[in-house]
Swiss-Prot record:
<comment type="similarity">
    <text>Belongs to the polyribonucleotide nucleotidyltransferase family.</text>
</comment>
<comment type="function">
    <text>Involved in mRNA degradation. Catalyzes the phosphorolysis of single-stranded polyribonucleotides processively in the 3'- to 5'-direction.</text>
</comment>
<dbReference type="InterPro" id="IPR004087">
    <property type="entry name" value="KH_dom"/>
</dbReference>
<dbReference type="InterPro" id="IPR036345">
    <property type="entry name" value="ExoRNase_PH_dom2_sf"/>
</dbReference>
<keyword id="KW-0460">Magnesium</keyword>
<keyword id="KW-0963">Cytoplasm</keyword>
<keyword id="KW-0548">Nucleotidyltransferase</keyword>
<feature type="compositionally biased region" description="Low complexity">
    <location>
        <begin position="694"/>
        <end position="711"/>
    </location>
</feature>
<keyword id="KW-0808">Transferase</keyword>
<dbReference type="GO" id="GO:0005829">
    <property type="term" value="C:cytosol"/>
</dbReference>
<dbReference type="InterPro" id="IPR036612">
    <property type="entry name" value="KH_dom_type_1_sf"/>
</dbReference>
<feature type="binding site">
    <location>
        <position position="492"/>
    </location>
    <ligand>
        <name>Mg(2+)</name>
    </ligand>
</feature>
<feature type="domain" description="KH">
    <location>
        <begin position="553"/>
        <end position="612"/>
    </location>
</feature>
<dbReference type="InterPro" id="IPR036456">
    <property type="entry name" value="PNPase_PH_RNA-bd_sf"/>
</dbReference>
<protein>
    <recommendedName>
        <fullName>Polyribonucleotide nucleotidyltransferase</fullName>
        <ecNumber>2.7.7.8</ecNumber>
    </recommendedName>
</protein>
<dbReference type="Pfam" id="PF00013">
    <property type="entry name" value="KH_1"/>
</dbReference>
<dbReference type="GO" id="GO:0006402">
    <property type="term" value="P:mRNA catabolic process"/>
</dbReference>
Amino acid sequence: MLNPIVRKFQYGQHTVTLETGMMARQATAAVMVSMDDTAVFVTVVGQKKAKPGQDFFPLTVNYQERTYAAGRIPGSFFRREGRPSEGETLIARLIDRPIRPLFPEGFVNEVQVIATVVSVNPQVNPDIVAMIGASAALSLSGIPFNGPIGAARVGYINDQYVLNPTQDELKESKLDLVVAGTEAAVLMVESEAELLSEDQMLGAVVFGHEQQQVVIQNINELVKEAGKPRWDWQPEPVNEALNARVAALAEARLSDAYRITDKQERYAQVDVIKSETIATLLAEDETLDENELGEILHAIEKNVVRSRVLAGEPRIDGREKDMIRGLDVRTGVLPRTHGSALFTRGETQALVTATLGTARDAQVLDELMGERTDTFLFHYNFPPYSVGETGMVGSPKRREIGHGRLAKRGVLAVMPDMDKFPYTVRVVSEITESNGSSSMASVCGASLALMDAGVPIKAAVAGIAMGLVKEGDNYVVLSDILGDEDHLGDMDFKVAGSRDGISALQMDIKIEGITKEIMQVALNQAKGARLHILGVMEQAINAPRGDISEFAPRIHTIKINPDKIKDVIGKGGSVIRALTEETGTTIEIEDDGTVKIAATDGEKAKNAIRRIEEITAEIEVGRVYNGKVTRIVDFGAFVAIGGGKEGLVHISQIADKRVEKVTDYLQMGQEVPVKVLEVDRQGRIRLSIKEATEQSQPAAAPEAPAAEQGE
């Protein structure tokens, strides 16, 4: 009954298994892909008929991680998986981006890809496995798909490229790059790097593409054995007469409209032309399909913009191919934030803030690969007003999560180490205007805001979006693309980095035939653009401010004897809780005795440090301290001498004469000098007021052990 078909092959240091025909036989196609115990089950379902009036391709990619894959039960209240995490959303996008361009134009049948992680080896990230599974399932399904694709992760360790590095190897790597493509062409790159050169990044892309050919070959072999018949799908025949009629009415007018440099004005004019053209044609023949007319008009728009670029004419906004739009850079624009910047590039604008917090503010991520703490948070918000529209405002959408992660990757390489700058840092980018590459504007704004906040970043970083228009062997690479150029072009190519190298690279290619040489031209052109933007940014602020904001918490660090940690924490946390409440500070203690005190007020921090030093102070026998009477008993009085330590003054040690009644000499709360006579094995302290008053030396406060103290 069950007849599994299996293919095994070696992929770098891992063994990959593709299995189909065993499960989910009612899906259009299903594949179980495993790579060294990390297994992802991928299904594809395609509808044989498109919905009437459907004018876009409804492809959905869902990626879901099951905690049973790692032998765990979810920690949520309901003890089951809920909405997708940020990590799951990012991997769903990673799968979607290289497969979407491979469906034929005009194909609008609904297709859903579901990738479920069912087993995980902590050393093998499921994302590459899921991408291979999606490629295999689509290739097996018979759905019109111009694949398969391969996928590879590339690391860079000891000046060598490493194929599909393990999680441990990635910690040593200067690069984390994912590349996907067909046999002939690269389609997608997603990466972060420790400021590598253009040549090193391009080498990694080429290396990954070469290595993934084994995946493509094995998927093709599996399809020969188990593939379903290819769907008999044909695109709608082109109505040449209608195309010519629409072009006659609209092409010249659209060509003129695309010389309007202001985005909103241009959009308004284009909308008028489209509406009037459609109205004219429907008046001539009411049986015409309005959606079809819209598609023809869109194709004319695309052709107008592309042909003008290829002919060497100025772009939509009048720029040459390698020109950057006008820049406006401002820092310190919000008075009470810890750091802020307003970065404007043409009609794209980002208001970016940086906020400093303590280690307690770090985000704890409960991931399938294990729990980790993130001390650098980057959030990107894209409100509808940024493009002059109305819309829903709420939790971030897939696009916002993806753009935020890309911008974070651009900045991560220059962030200081926690031991040098022990703060959790949150950057928020509010896109206030958008016309192309708001994610790269967020990188520039983040660099400025972090410097304004006094975060000692290693270098300033900037980002730029590149585009490509290609027809045959003729191509033009565009710097700093507009939204329209992104939409109508063949490649979206985003590069972020410093003067020294690249920190993030993202490529999405919509056509085949992008060669290594074209990518080289784009990278070199992007470098020139990046250096130009950095030059303008450096005029506004060229180094991190010498001090953090007065409104940011200052972290003071002292070192105590690890044996004394229990004294500072107290029973059930009572001492540290009282300390934080009474001093108005935040206190964190590490196992090695490092104590971090965070406060916006320096005096509060000093008070907390003094009290911690008192608690951890060693009591010195023979020394005189100032104490306070805390309890009176028949045989003497208990006196607190600081740091939560209390000793007994026996009735015989109160005065140099016989004392009948303790209360004749001492009252509750009275401050008295006391001399330490003895500290016994159990830590009990014997004190004397009599001997303290006889001594001429002044009373002392408890002395703290030598401490490393810094800010």
